[in-house]
Amino acid sequence: MAKIIAFDEKARRGLEGGMNQLADAVKVTLGPKGRNVVLEKKWGAPTITNDGVSIAKEIELEDPYEKIGAELVKEVAKKTDDVAGDGTTTATVLAQALVKEGLRNVAAGANPMALKRGIEKAVEAVSGALLEQAKDVETKEQIASTASISAADTQIGELIAEAMDKVGKEGVITVEEFQTFGLELELTEGMGFDKGYISAYFATDMERMEASLDDPYILIANSKIGNVKDLLPLLEKVMQSGKPLLIIAEDVEGEALSTLVVNKIRGTFKSVAVKAPGFGDRRKAMLGDIAILTGGEVISEEVGLKLENAGLDLLGRARKVVITKDETTIVDGAGDTDQVNGRVAQIRAEIENSDSDYDREKLQERLANVAGGVAVIKAGAATEVELKERKERKHRIEDAVRNAKAAVEEGIVAGGGVALLQASQVFEKLELTGDEATGANAVKLALEAPLKQIPSTAVSRAAWSWRRCATSPWATA
């Protein structure tokens, strides 16, 4: 396929045009009086939403340069959604304003690398100022309030606060679609770890880029799996059972990985491979935790177990496993309760006997994983109309969970763009010169953009609001 190549101003303007088209469609939803956007669907009724990342995902542009520009802003919205669960529209507005000011200065002859250094120094200073402003979120009521705002639903906020209260602030909370009305909270045995699928081809939900396995077998191996001949006997047994397979191993590569991916794409066999969490002895211990929670065995030659000889009796089981690119959550493992309790007691004893702060911290993480369990929020619907939109409701709850966890970790600040504007006062302390100072000034101007956008969507007096918020002491979080 022939490539279209552009340089300098033509390339920059093409990228900016795509960014502006996407950002202009998204930013009208900002604020308490933000507008809704109607999204056409290939089939069925159109979707009405004010969720920034949902709008961004739907935008596809014809011009190749504009398409690249739009994709860059999509990535901004998506990363914000993944980390914080909210604030995607604000992030889009900031990105648009920063790019606009940056390109204006580049066109005027500024050095792009010096601008970049100035932007990075300014962003670091602003991040520090925002953290200083932040109020801690500690009580159940504060968590419920934060999650309620994100989900635009008080009941969802209270349920998330209840879930965090039961499994701890570092605990695993997962959301499942439920075939009935309303919301329900269930606490089950299970765990999560920070390793995702090895290949994106394993994803079963391409929109969310996650894989979901119902009632799977779980192979736990403390070694690399590369030779498909070693894996084939076990694969045939699992395929005969009609169940999906989750493979947790040091690595899955070569023929073995290719075979799993090809069978998944063809629809012959549903499986997901993930790398084992941790390293060295810690990995061995965490694999042992997973084995006990799921009722399986760790396949390792150290204990005389070889992959080619493994049967279904050595595999773990769970009611459900959800895997994203970054993490794996095992829900309701089939492990024996007495063995799980014994493992908890063993880890607690190791914590008491440990002299190393680092080791103690890692043991505490393992203890939380094994003993804390998994909180499952079952998302039904309040009405028959909502029942048709259950998937969107599930995504909204997942975003609210991430939002609540981010608030607990780093605190909350004044909303409405006020905190960003007040954080810009930190620029008075930055001692930058030349194009680095110009880059920092671009950040300062971008920080004003969200607060200027909110009144414009509400058809209000933007200039008056901006001046008052910049100077009002009550606006400080």
Swiss-Prot record:
The biological processes this protein is annotated with in GO are: protein refolding
Q: What is its EC number?
A: 5.6.1.7
Per UniProt, subcellular location reads as: Cytoplasm
List the Gene3D superfamilies hit by this protein, alphabetically: GroEL, GroEL-like equatorial domain, TCP-1-like chaperonin intermediate domain
Looking up InterPro entries in the UniProt record yields: Chaperonin_Cpn60_CS, Cpn60/GroEL, Cpn60/GroEL/TCP-1, GroEL-like_apical_dom_sf, GROEL-like_equatorial_sf, TCP-1-like_intermed_sf
Q: Domain of life, per the record?
A: Bacteria
Write out the GO cellular component annotations. Answer: cytoplasm
Q: Which GO molecular function, any one, fits this protein according to its record?
A: isomerase activity
Keywords of the record, alphabetical order, are: ATP-binding, Chaperone, Cytoplasm, Isomerase, Nucleotide-binding
The UniProt record gives the binding positions of ATP as 29-32, 86-90, 416
Note the SUPFAM superfamilies from the entry.
GroEL apical domain-like, GroEL equatorial domain-like
The record's catalysed reaction(s) read: ATP + H2O + a folded polypeptide = ADP + phosphate + an unfolded polypeptide
A Pfam family (short name) is Cpn60_TCP1
- Entry-linked CDD domains: GroEL
Question: What family is this protein classified in?
Answer: Belongs to the chaperonin (HSP60) family.
Q: How does it assemble?
A: Forms a cylinder of 14 subunits composed of two heptameric rings stacked back-to-back. Interacts with the co-chaperonin GroES.
Main function: Together with its co-chaperonin GroES, plays an essential role in assisting protein folding. The GroEL-GroES system forms a nano-cage that allows encapsulation of the non-native substrate proteins and provides a physical environment optimized to promote and accelerate protein folding.
Name the UniProt record assigns to this protein: Chaperonin GroEL 2
